[in-house]
From Swiss-Prot:
InterPro entries: FAD/NAD-bd_sf (IPR036188), Ferredox_Rdtase (IPR055275), Ferredox_Rdtase_adrenod (IPR021163). Gene3D superfamilies: FAD/NAD(P)-binding domain, NAD(P)-binding Rossmann-like Domain. This is Probable NADPH:adrenodoxin oxidoreductase, mitochondrial. The gene is ARH1. It catalyses: 2 reduced [adrenodoxin] + NADP(+) + H(+) = 2 oxidized [adrenodoxin] + NADPH. It holds the Pfam family NAD_binding_8. NADP(+) binds at residues 177-180, 223-224, 235, 414. It is an enzyme of class 1 (oxidoreductase). It comes from the Eukaryota. PANTHER family: GLUTAMATE SYNTHASE 1 [NADH], CHLOROPLASTIC-LIKE. It comes from Saccharomyces cerevisiae (strain ATCC 204508 / S288c). Its main location: mitochondrion. It is a peripheral membrane protein.
Length: 493
């Protein structure tokens, strides 16, 4: 463990100091851009509440999508280059295991740094706000569920998951139809197909529990219609292609028929989606294009199903005598003539779906830091109030030297590539301001000598051990699942 005082000082070079709160893609891409593009010397420190870096890339990406995590290679190369003593212009430090606002106050960063960038992402959940949503066994948010199967130390051994009776889960409901909802559908409907999951970095504890679930049916429930689906074609295709394992996709004809959609009114991506669905809904031998006939279903036919369900609003989560979910009450919706964002509920037409597990995938929500109110930092619903990345006060004025990037700046939307673009744009504004800002004080220091934390070298030790554990288990990586395991992973080689 490293217990050192970080001092941004050099006898030869005056470096301006930048602190970034959060080590996920937005934080690391911001650091990368600053270190690669700044014409003036910088000392950049990333602060992370977990002992390990990479945030949503490490804990939010589907285990069977390792290519999405390629950004971690870029971050690692950057960290190694700029934390090396041989780099004379810029310096980089990683400080893990410290929560800004707790062990170190945000005000302390603001008082000791030339710029502070908040890139800590969205750590809350958007809610249904219906009876039964809270406290019902077998009801989880997508954020909780994804963090659990990805081995996040806050969730990996959470008793809500480990004590849940997965052997009773046959029917699943998922509220939402974005990419995260499709990821979760894929995990659940193919939970017993070892060739998909056994070599990934999915938590072995979670996978062993999921394997107990005899999942037969997953229903993705959306308030609006097919046109307003939030998923991408790539994610949807992956679900359709599970048919080779006997997994069949379904859409009720009242929600989808090719003739419903005039190609001249939609973009190319949507028209491809229509073609994809219309082809995959046909029997395998009746499909017209080879692209949709990659691998036939087994001769025994289909025994598991997922379904895209539309124009429904959840009204109530119903429990059994033991406090576990047993059904979901919903009503039909209809869209206004102008296809407005708010569908109209038909509360006189209520139905009930039998479900053994319910995942709410409504999006992640940003949460303000505890000091925001005291420091008069503006917060707008689920993200930090800002003007092109420059944070605003509660009264709408620019807060000096304080910035935001990523989801906490704009809300939980977009993929890692769009997060990168946002981080670069904010990084450019930070550089613009630093270049014209006043003279740097000769010594800016934050004393960490008595605070337990990890460094980049500590992460390298943890990383090496996780990869070695994974190799022994025939996986790409076997993550440490608790804070205790992560801290212990720092010791030794």
């Amino acid at each position: 463990m490293s217990f050192v005082q970080i001092r941004h000082i050099s006898s030869q070079i005056n470096r301006k100091t930048v602190s970034i709160v959060g080590s996920g893609p937005s934080g690391f891409y911001t650091a990368y851009h600053l270190l690669k593009k700044s014409p003036i010397p910088l000392n950049v420190t990333i602060w992370e509440k977990l002992p390990v870096p990479f945030g949503l890339s490490r804990y939010g990406v589907a285990p069977d999508h390792p290519e999405v995590k390629n950004c971690e290679e870029t971050f690692t190369t950057c960290a190694e280059e700029f934390s090396s003593p041989t780099n004379q212009k810029h310096k980089f430090s990683f400080v893990g295991g410290i929560t800004i606002g707790k062990e170190i106050l945000l005000k302390e960063l603001l008082d000791n740094q030339d710029a502070v960038i908040l890139s800590y992402g969205c750590t809350g959940d958007r809610k249904l706000n219906i009876p039964g949503e809270l406290g019902t066994k077998g009801v989880f948010s997508s954020r909780e569920f994804v963090n659990w199967y990805n081995g996040h130390p806050d969730f990996a051994k959470d008793k809500r998951f480990t004590d849940f009776d997965w052997s009773k889960v046959s029917k699943v409901g998922i509220i939402g139809n974005g990419n995260v909802a499709l990821d979760i559908t894929r995990v659940l409907i193919s939970n017993q197909i070892d060739e998909i999951w056994e070599n990934t970095d999915i938590s072995s504890l979670a996978l062993n529990l999921l394997r107990r679930a005899p999942v037969k049916d997953v229903k993705l429930i959306a308030r609006r219609d097919f046109v307003h689906s939030k998923f991408t074609n790539k994610e949807l295709r992956e679900l359709w292609e599970l048919e080779k394992y006997g997994i069949r996709g379904r859409i009720d004809p009242k929600f989808f028929q090719k003739e419903m959609f005039d190609p001249s009114k939609y973009d190319r991506a949507f028209n491809r989606r229509v073609e994809m669905c219309s082809e995959y809904l046909k029997p395998f031998n009746e499909r017209s294009k080879k692209n949709y006939k990659k691998a036939p279903p087994p001769s025994s036919g289909y025994d598991k199903f997922w379904e895209l369900d539309y124009l429904k609003t959840p009204l109530k989560i119903n429990r059994d005598d033991f406090g576990a979910i047993n059904s979901l009450s919903l009503c039909n919706n209809r869209l206004n003539e102008d296809n407005s964002l708010q569908p109209l509920k038909d509360v006189n037409n209520i139905m009930t779906y039998k479900v053994d597990l319910l995942i709410t995938s409504l999006g992640y929500a940003g949460v303000p830091m505890p000091e925001f109110s005291k420091l008069s930092i503006g917060f707008d619903k689920d993200h930090i109030a800002n003007k092109q990345g420059r944070v605003l006060t509660s009264s709408g004025e620019i807060f000096p030297h304080l910035y935001a990037s990523g989801w906490i700046r704009k809300g939980s939307q977009g993929v890692i590539a769009s997060t990168m673009q946002d981080a670069f744009e904010v990084g450019d504004r930070v550089i613009q301001d630093l270049v014209v800002s006043g003279a740097l004080s000769l010594e800016n220091s934050i004393d960490l000598s008595n605070i337990k934390h990890t460094t980049w070298k500590d992460w390298e030790r943890i990383n090496k051990k996780e990869l070695l554990r994974g190799k022994k288990e025939h996986k790409t990586r076997s993550k440490f699942l608790t804070f205790e395991e992560l801290w212990n992973g720092v010791e030794g080689i």
